[in-house]
Design a protein with these regions (language model features):
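Generic alpha-helix initiation/capping and coil-helix boundary signal
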Residues: 2, 16-20, 86
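A short, basic/flexible loop-to-alpha-helix module at the beginning of a structural domain
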Residues: 1-8
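Generic secretory/membrane-interface signal
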Residues: 4, 32-33, 104
């Protein structure tokens, strides 16, 4: 039996993992109507459930060299990462970390 459900939305997010949920929240903060579509329950399927202990945040005030962080990031990704994307991710990681903390996300200590 084919089921069809038409939904009008400003933003359609495919995938309810960490990135999808984050994108949906940020779009909703802009006053947009958001719909998330996932194969299971948001946050309960896909790669995000295994990534909960693999966060890397870059803060230049911590005195850590950016290139050291990039090298660690590439090592964790077994050198199959796209370096330009990694650079964007690290440069935006602190702001994203602060957003998540402000939403009540608890991070494990170092």
């Amino acid at each position: 039996m084919l089921l069809e459900n038409q939904v009008e939305t400003d933003v359609l997010v495919i995938g309810g993992g960490i990135a999808g949920c984050f994108a949906a929240i940020k779009a909703k903060e802009q006053g947009l109507d958001v719909t998330i579509v996932d194969k299971a329950y948001a946050g309960k399927s896909g790669a995000s459930i295994g990534a909960c202990r693999s966060w890397m945040v870059y803060n230049p005030e911590w005195g850590v060299d950016f290139n050291e962080c990039m090298n660690a990031f590439n090592t964790e990704g077994e050198y199959i990462n796209h370096r330009e994307w990694d650079e964007i991710i690290l440069n935006e990681s602190l702001a994203i970390y602060h957003d998540l903390v402000s939403w009540g996300v608890k991070f494990p200590p170092d």
